[in-house]
Amino acid sequence: MTIRYPNGQVYRQPGPTKSKSSKFANVNFGDRGMSLEQEINDSNAYYLENNIAVIHKKPTPIQIVKVDYPKRSAAVIREAYFKQASTTDYNGVYRGKYLDFEAKETKNKTAFPLKNFHEHQIKHMRQCLAQSGICFVIIRFASLGRLFLLTASDLFTYWDHQGDGGRKSIPLTDIEHLAAELHYQINPRIPYLDALDHIIDETSSIH
């Protein structure tokens, strides 16, 4: 079956990553050829298996274009396209709270470009916040090997300012001040719920 992205490019299943032999003391848990998405998926699997949280990646909707019917009782999809995702990457429940978040990365070393986000994602997070959900973004500076968890409210400040003539990126220095830096470990690979604990506790104390 041929699956295509919205731009028509053919989707190809990524092959297995080759393991590299190294001493445990020199392992950088963020440098194993994994995508940020896979690292978060692995972390979510750990949280689920240990009854800590239930968080899943939302499936990307697919539009079926061509179907063959070699048998009356079976249909074979020959061609399909990934549709544009309408919301964010992940959602779930933790400590009785609804979570909704996006994961993005950049090769830029000094700022995070706001063009990595889409208007429909910002709108969706605003709607979730209005219903007392907890929304945030996990940002990775790939060239620096650094990870941050930034609340949606802080993201909105920069998103709204760009429409008023403000800069179209968030400086790394601002992210260092506003966001919680996440550090790789063995399990979970990205312990982002540790940072969320502080956000939930602060929110609970206000109410």
Swiss-Prot record:
GO terms for molecular function: endonuclease activity; magnesium ion binding; nucleic acid binding. The keyword rRNA processing does not apply. The record marks K104 as: Transition state stabilizer. GO terms for biological process: chromosome segregation; DNA recombination; DNA repair. SUPFAM superfamilies: Restriction endonuclease-like (SSF52980). The keyword DNA repair applies. Binds 1 Mg(2+) ion per subunit. Gene3D superfamilies: 3.40.1350.10. HAMAP family: RecU (MF_00130). This is Holliday junction resolvase RecU. It comes from Lactiplantibacillus plantarum (strain ATCC BAA-793 / NCIMB 8826 / WCFS1) (Lactobacillus plantarum). The gene is recU.
